[in-house]
Design a protein with these regions (language model features):
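Glycine-/acidic-rich phosphate or pyrophosphate-binding loops and their flanking alpha/beta elements
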Residues: 251-263
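Low-complexity, Gly/Ser/Thr/Pro-rich intrinsically disordered linker/tail segments
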Residues: 328, 333-376
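Extended, charge-rich low-complexity interaction segments
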Residues: 208-214, 239-250, 326-343
Length: 376
């Protein structure tokens, strides 16, 4: 009977055709056509580089179970052993098998410039509870009588001027608001700083987002850390430690109780969510869970905080596809977060607008608000 290889033996086989110096950040690399021809040897090298990123750089690899690892490694081994001349698009279709089974809503393989992107196949359909009030804008802030309304559709690619304007506007309306509605529906993430600043002001204190934040510590992971030297990864001093993983541990912290005297806002807050909310969009939910007078209205968020912190965009050498992975793993306070996201306090049925439910909660059922991006 043939010996069944261990996970470590399967990993070593796939890593033999690449080295640390093959780990290159995507940067502004020119896109290549999906029809780019790859030789069998180039395919094998691409698979090995892909495997090196997955096994040694990707923050989630140590935390996935052995069954999943074996499935992934067997797929990659089969692609490697059966390599033949093919196009970049054909290779993407083969590597898709790996991405689709990893329960991570951030990890993706992207053929830049050609709208060819592969993400996990584990996303769930959520009910339609309306779209973000900001419509096509990044954010919108308004005050209707004594109700503050903040819609944040995206946190991606904000300019310094936009961040300053956002901060100035919400600081202007909160003192005049008795209730606050924060609409984060459709918010797939970006930089979390604007929403963390808002949450910290409301709470009067910064609370940890996770029990632990964990980073890989090996030559490949540390090389990638240097490629992204201006990121938050710098707070982990990996070069001076021998542990395979290093973490900042919040699990034993005594969390401060909510203090109305220090809080910037003490009225009811209604946070609107849907199934497209993930990543930095969910960080506002993570922070506001500590607020005693908050209700989440809508549907479960997607679940995208465990593996998506500090993204690394890694280049595959011949196809110029980018393999994008998180570098910091978050041990969340919510179990199975990546599969379930945050569950709302008030769950809306399909076709029910979460904004209407929020106003009903406030007791203004007949109060009409102009809603950009929502059809009445």
């Amino acid at each position: 009977m043939a010996k069944i290889p261990s996970v470590k033996e399967m990993e070593d086989f796939l890593l033999q055709d690449s080295k640390t110096s093959d780990l290159v950040a995507a940067g502004d690399t020119n896109a290549k056509s999906p029809d780019t021809k790859l030789t069998a040897h180039q395919v094998q090298h691409e698979v090995s580089v892909f495997s090196r990123v997955l096994i040694n750089v990707y923050c989630g690899w140590p935390f996935h179970d052995e069954i999943l690892k074996r499935r992934v490694l067997q797929i990659l081994t089969d692609i490697y052993k059966n390599a033949h001349d093919m196009t970049s698009l054909e290779l993407l279709e083969q590597l898709k098998q790996v991405i689709k089974i990893i329960p991570d809503n951030h990890i993706n393989l992207n053929m830049v410039g050609y709208h060819k992107e592969v993400r996990t196949g584990l996303r769930k359909q959520r009910p339609n509870v309306g779209s973000n009030i900001a419509g096509d804008e990044k954010f919108i802030i308004d005050l209707k009588n004594d109700i503050g309304i903040i819609g944040i559709r995206t946190l991606s690619k904000w300019s310094a001027e936009e961040r300053e304007s956002f901060d100035k506007q919400w600081r202007a309306i909160l003192p005049k608001s008795k209730s606050l509605i924060v609409d984060i529906r459709d918010n797939g993430g970006g930089s979390s700083r604007p929403v963390e600043s808002l949450a910290r002001y409301i709470l009067g204190h910064r609370y940890p987002a996770a029990r632990k934040e964990i980073i890989r510590n090996n030559p490949d992971a540390n090389a990638v850390k240097k490629l992204y030297k201006n990121s938050d990864i710098d707070k982990f001093n990996v070069d001076s430690a021998d542990d395979p993983v290093i973490y900042s541990d919040h699990s034993a912290e005594v969390l401060p109780k909510f203090d109305p005297g220090k809080a910037g806002f003490t009225g009811p807050v209604y946070v609107l969510t849907n199934g497209r909310v993930m990543s930095s969009g969910e960080i506002f939910c993570t922070n506001m869970r500590y607020y005693p007078n908050v209700k989440f209205i809508g549907t479960n968020t997607r679940g995208g905080e465990v593996y998506g912190y500090n993204y690394a965009y890694m280049l595959l050498p011949y196809s110029h596809m980018t393999f994008n992975v998180g570098c910091v793993y978050r041990d969340m306070f919510v179990e199975n977060f990546e599969l379930n996201g945050y569950k709302p306090d008030i769950e809306c049925e399909d076709g029910t607008d979460a904004m209407d439910v929020a106003f009903a909660q406030i007791g203004r059922k007949n109060f009409m608000v102009h809603q950009k991006g929502l059809e009445k």
